[in-house]
């Protein structure tokens, strides 16, 4: 049975025909919905030390993050973001719709 998909982040801040801007705010121990990245996106890290990505195959990776860092990410991954650190994790995610 396939897992239901949720949003790529906690809160949609803005949307138009070209972009969707999301906020992902995870307190220590908190996790996101299981989600799929169907669009290319830009991540802007605002706070945190690490965030884990738990995949549907049971594997997990820990990603060290540095506030102020910006990443471009291609679409295709399906995961749950989990904050297993002792500090807040905050990022802004900009999905690029094209056009």
Positions of predicted regions on the chain:
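Short beta-strand His + acidic residue motifs that chelate non-heme Fe in jelly-roll/DSBH
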Residues: 32-34, 52-53, 78-85
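A short glycine-rich, His/Asp/Glu-containing loop-to-beta-strand
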Residues: 6-33, 40-43, 94
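Short acidic-glycine-tyrosine-enriched beta hairpin
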Residues: 57-75
């Amino acid at each position: 049975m396939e897992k239901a998909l949720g949003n790529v982040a906690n809160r949609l801040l803005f949307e138009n025909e070209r972009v969707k801007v999301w906020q992902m705010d995870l307190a220590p121990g908190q996790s996101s919905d299981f989600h799929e990245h169907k669009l290319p996106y830009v991540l802007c890290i605002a706070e945190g030390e690490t965030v884990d990505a738990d995949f549907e195959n049971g594997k997990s990776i820990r990603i060290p993050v540095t506030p102020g860092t910006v990443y471009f990410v291609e679409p295709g991954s399906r995961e749950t973001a989990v904050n297993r650190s002792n500090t807040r994790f905050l990022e802004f995610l900009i999905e690029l719709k094209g056009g």
